[in-house]
């Protein structure tokens, strides 16, 4: 898999008039492997358990709320006619899209207004991230074939894979491109492993669903701005699938016994579940057992 790093390519500001992105918490579903849950287990098996099995609530952070809003605005931007996909249109979508998110999710409704109005540079930060997007791509030139798409597949090994894909673009001459937006800080070259893991994960899922791998993987860091572009290799993706098999086997083994051990480290300082962690003299709730579909 080859990689290209590109900081703010020289797209001019789009001219023209102003005009008009995890599986939800509905009915319980059997656990499946996703990039975020895989990262949780590798970071701390107990964290995985509390999120994926106990499903303990966590209040969204301001950064997460901003990310949710920016993803939703970019998704809505692509519903506009191509000529209207300009920076002013994206900024104009913030208020109505934010209102829709609040109406659909009480947790967001409790946090989003404060993030936009009282947090330091709240609304300005959302606008800055949206403006940065236009430094990386010109959406007037793109016509996605899928946006904010839930993808699910079961490998031949029985490992269930699940997640949301931000965008899939059809490419001239055949093939397709997988695009993911990030609103957090861009990693340095030595710390791209987690982001690359996620892109490989979704590329493998699409390979299994479509029978062919993406021709391109684009990871767009709006807080940079920085574009990372990868060219996937199908055989490498299939080897990566065997890595996921091993990871899922470890999760299922822990699930059978309830032995999800804590793994103390620097990230403990910001962990919501530290009060329940034995490594910090906390007591986790009784293990409810591995969830099975009803």
Task: Tell what function each PLM region has.
Residues 69-80, 250-254:
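Solvent-exposed, amphipathic alpha-helical segments
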Residues 149-240, 244:
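Mg2+/Mn2+-dependent nuclease catalytic core
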Residues 54-63, 80-84, 188-189, 258-259:
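Short, polar/flexible loop-turn hinges at active-site or ligand-entry regions and domain interfaces
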Residues 1-64, 293-294:
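C-terminal, charged and often intrinsically disordered regions of DNA end-processing helicases
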Residues 62, 66, 70, 122, ...:
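Hydrophobic (often cysteine-bearing) scaffold residues that line and stabilize catalytic clefts
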Residues 63, 67, 112-120, 261:
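Conserved phosphate/pyrophosphate-binding and hydrolysis machinery centered on Walker-type P-loop NTPases
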Residues 32, 205-294:
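Metal-dependent nuclease catalytic regions and adjoining charged, substrate-binding loops involved
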């Amino acid at each position: 898999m080859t990689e290209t790093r590109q900081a703010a390519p020289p797209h001019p500001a789009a001219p023209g008039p102003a005009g008009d992105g995890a599986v939800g918490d509905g009915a319980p579903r059997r656990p499946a492997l996703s990039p975020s849950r895989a990262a949780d287990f590798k970071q701390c098996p107990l964290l995985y358990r509390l999120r994926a099995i106990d499903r303990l609530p966590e209040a969204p952070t301001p950064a997460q709320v901003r990310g949710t809003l920016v993803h939703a605005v970019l998704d809505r931007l692509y519903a506009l006619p191509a000529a209207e996909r300009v920076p002013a249109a994206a900024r104009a979508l913030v208020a109505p899209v934010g209102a829709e998110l609040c109406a659909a999710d009480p947790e967001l409704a409790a946090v989003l207004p404060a993030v936009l109005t009282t947090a330091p540079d709240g609304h300005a930060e959302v606008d800055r991230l949206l403006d940065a997007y236009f430094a990386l791509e010109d959406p007037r030139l793109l016509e996605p074939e899928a946006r904010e798409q839930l993808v699910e597949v079961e490998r031949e090994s029985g490992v269930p894979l699940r997640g949301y894909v931000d965008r899939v673009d059809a490419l001239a001459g055949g093939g397709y491109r997988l695009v993911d937006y990030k609103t957090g800080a861009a990693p340095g070259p030595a710390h791209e492993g987690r982001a690359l893991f996620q892109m490989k994960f979704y590329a493998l899922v699409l390979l299994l669903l479509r029978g062919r791998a993406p021709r391109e993987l684009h990871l767009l860091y709006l807080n940079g701005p920085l574009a990372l572009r990868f060219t996937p290799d199908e055989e490498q993706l299939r080897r990566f699938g065997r890595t996921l098999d091993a990871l899922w086997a470890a999760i299922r083994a822990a699930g059978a016994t309830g032995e999800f051990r804590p793994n103390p480290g620097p990230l403990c300082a910001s962990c919501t579940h530290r009060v329940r962690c034995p490594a910090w003299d906390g007591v986790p709730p009784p293990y409810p057992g591995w969830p099975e579909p009803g």
